[in-house]
């Protein structure tokens, strides 16, 4: 997969690209990540890429021509171009998996100031947000999305690790424990030390459903529960009601 990130702050990504799994994924050629300085594509003096908005208003807008030049230079028949914007569709684990499977070349556009000249809509396939809040620019969302997709690429991390991630299966992850067995009176649940794989699986499923029901019930609304999950969830609700 190729990910091209368009930004006016290319140095923002230096540490991100040279640390941990992202670094290894690049070195192993499992992903290609390129950072493009938008200022190199403006015709205005001093690398200027913004101007005042027509009709008035606070702040400055990023001008359209540099985006047009750079994106058309990068685009291929396999390109999917995304504008990072608080107005966009919310990015989630399902989107990350879908893009991992279906997109060969992803362009991420980082906005700044009061936004971008709306003619940018002629160049993009989708607007994406990482949540209902506003940041100073698109660089952090670009890193979030790049990290989320890259870790799903085969060989970057063990598949068993991400298949049990929170949200990967549409549920929050069950509680996990490691050594020491007991600390300050807090002990690891006995069932996890039993060696009984089926009982451990059922315990984890129950805890996962319980955590999701308590913290993110919205995730269960559209979930097609299995008979096993429905039975366990009914038990959870009864137990909570009796408390």
From Swiss-Prot:
Its EC number is 2.1.1.228. It catalyses: guanosine(37) in tRNA + S-adenosyl-L-methionine = N(1)-methylguanosine(37) in tRNA + S-adenosyl-L-homocysteine + H(+). GO terms for cellular component: cytosol. Homodimer. It comes from the Bacteria. It holds the Pfam family tRNA_m1G_MT. This is tRNA (guanine-N(1)-)-methyltransferase. GO terms for biological process: tRNA N1-guanine methylation. Keywords: Cytoplasm, Methyltransferase, S-adenosyl-L-methionine, Transferase, tRNA processing. One of its GO terms (molecular function) is tRNA (guanine(37)-N1)-methyltransferase activity. Coiled coil: none annotated. Specifically methylates guanosine-37 in various tRNAs. S-adenosyl-L-methionine binds at residues 111, 130-135. Belongs to the RNA methyltransferase TrmD family. Its main location: cytoplasm. InterPro entries: Alpha/beta_knot_MTases, tRNA_m1G_MeTrfase_C_sf, tRNA_m1G_MeTrfase_TrmD, tRNA_m1G_MTases_N, tRNA_MeTrfase_TRMD/TRM10. It is found in: Cytoplasm. Signal peptide: none annotated.
């Amino acid at each position: 997969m190729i990910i091209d990130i368009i930004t006016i702050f290319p140095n923002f990504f230096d540490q991100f690209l040279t640390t941990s799994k992202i670094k290894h994924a690049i070195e192993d050629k499992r992903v290609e990540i390129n950072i493009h300085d938008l200022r190199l594509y403006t015709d205005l003096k001093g690398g200027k890429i913004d101007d005042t908005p027509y009709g008035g208003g606070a702040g400055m807008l990023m001008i359209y021509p540099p985006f047009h030049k750079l994106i058309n230079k990068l685009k291929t028949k396999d390109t999917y171009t995304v504008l990072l914007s608080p107005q966009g569709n919310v990015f989630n684990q399902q989107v990350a998996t879908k893009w991992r499977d279906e997109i060969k070349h992803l362009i991420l556009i980082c906005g700044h100031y009061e936004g971008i000249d709306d003619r940018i809509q002629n160049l993009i396939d989708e607007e994406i947000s990482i949540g209902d809040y506003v940041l100073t620019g698109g660089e952090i969302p670009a890193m979030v999305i790049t990290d989320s997709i890259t870790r799903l690429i085969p060989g970057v991390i063990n598949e068993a690790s991400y298949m049990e991630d929170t949200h990967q299966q549409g549920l929050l992850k069950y509680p996990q424990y490691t050594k020491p067995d007991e600390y300050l009176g807090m002990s690891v649940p006995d069932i996890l030390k039993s060696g009984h794989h089926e009982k451990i699986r059922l315990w984890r499923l129950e805890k996962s459903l319980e955590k999701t029901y308590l913290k993110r019930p919205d995730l269960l609304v559209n979930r097609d529960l299995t008979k096993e999950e429905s039975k366990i969830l009914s038990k959870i609700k009864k137990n909570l009601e009796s408390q």
